[in-house]
Design a protein with these regions (language model features):
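N-terminal helical cap/lid subdomain that shapes the substrate entry/recognition surface
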Residues: 1-13
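C-terminal cap/substrate-recognition subdomain and adjoining C-terminal extension
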Residues: 17, 22-23, 29-179
Length: 179
């Protein structure tokens, strides 16, 4: 998955930072809000209302998830190198995926004096298993089949959040447009 992201993010090579910043809100609306789950947003707000510290650890680039900043106390996301006002297409550090995500969580907990055994983590993929295993209250949300099976076997909470009804669905063209 890390190699996939590295290759995918190379497509940003030469992209002007200012233009990408302007486009990031549109990207957010198209890729994030189109998959938005109101229950997930409510859940984060409930955690904050209870005084819980909220952290989003994601493999999505920082400028893509920046509009979520008001919802979370902190966001850990990969960044791209910048040279002369343009993105290089190279990440500044390894994206937080798999064990790297769990290590980022442990590091964050250490730096902020947090007890992971009293913490909750939400995830949908088996690649997030190390992070889920690091906390006292793991939750599989809209999990892939393998994670759902494992979570149930381990007695973890499994939740299925529903997307916004009427969300725009991106479709691929079936052929070239007719003139």
């Amino acid at each position: 998955r890390t190699d996939f992201l590295r290759n995918f993010y190379r497509k940003y090579e030469g992209a002007p930072v200012l233009q990408v910043d302007e486009d990031s809100l549109e990207m957010f609306n198209e890729f994030i809000l189109a998959k938005s789950f109101p229950a997930a947003i409510r859940r984060v707000r409930e955690h904050r209302a209870l005084g819980h510290r909220t952290l989003l650890i994601t493999g999505a680039l920082d400028f893509v998830v920046q509009p979520l900043k008001p919802l979370f106390d902190e966001i850990l996301a990969p960044s791209l190198e910048i040279n002369g006002g343009k993105y290089s297409g190279r990440m500044t550090h390894v994206p937080p995926i798999g064990e790297t995500r769990a290590a980022a969580l442990r590091s964050y907990a250490d730096e902020n004096n947090l007890d992971l055994k009293e913490s909750i983590a939400y995830a949908d993929s088996t690649s997030d298993l190390p992070m889920l295993e690091a906390v006292g209250f793991p939750v599989a949300v809209n999990p892939e089949t393998k994670l759902a099976t494992l979570a149930r076997r381990r007695g973890w909470l499994v939740e299925n959040f529903q997307p916004i009804s009427g969300s725009p669905k991106k479709t691929l063209p079936l052929g070239s447009k007719k003139e």
